Amino acid sequence: MARKDDLYQLLKPVVEGMGCDFWGMDYIAQGKRSLLRIYIDKESGVLVDDCEKVSRQISAILDVEDPIKGEYTLEVSSPGWDRPLFNVEQYKAYIGSIIEVRLQAPFNGRRKFKGLLAAVENDEIVLQVDAEEFIFPVETIDKANVVPQY
């Protein structure tokens, strides 16, 4: 597979050219058939029609450029209520929210943390979990999602 950065550089202009924000992407290897999930967003909200149009455009680009070797499924989606967080700017936008974080490697014997995103300083997040405060560099986070509050 192409590097994630290469895919990002290839696909971001396509998504933005269609009036959407490129929120992020996941590439999940699943045996013989992998999954490429692209998240798009819009201020007015993402409709199924938006996902369909962006999917067709991205599919055409991927067919021509062929950056992914082997079979894969392309999925285009809105980030949803439990939106994943991919970069520092997105973390900053959700300061004060409850988030779930899964680290690439264990910290204090665990990889999963859920707490209040208290701050973002430089490229690190400050997460308050009960009475404890943890500081994690964004680069050490494997996956993070906003926890919807109803």
UniProtKB/Swiss-Prot annotation:
Cellular compartments annotated: Cytoplasm
Key words of the record: Cytoplasm, Ribosome biogenesis
InterPro entries with a match to the protein in the record: Ribosome_maturation_RimP (IPR003728), RimP_C (IPR028998), RimP_C_sf (IPR036847), RimP_N (IPR028989), RimP_N_sf (IPR035956)
Source superkingdom: Bacteria
One Pfam family hit: RimP_N
Record SUPFAM superfamilies: YhbC-like, C-terminal domain, YhbC-like, N-terminal domain
A GO cellular-component term linked to this record: cytosol
UniProt-listed GO biological process terms: ribosomal small subunit assembly; translation
TM spans (from-to): none
Role this protein plays: Required for maturation of 30S ribosomal subunits.
Family named by the database record: Belongs to the RimP family.
Protein name per Swiss-Prot or TrEMBL: Ribosome maturation factor RimP
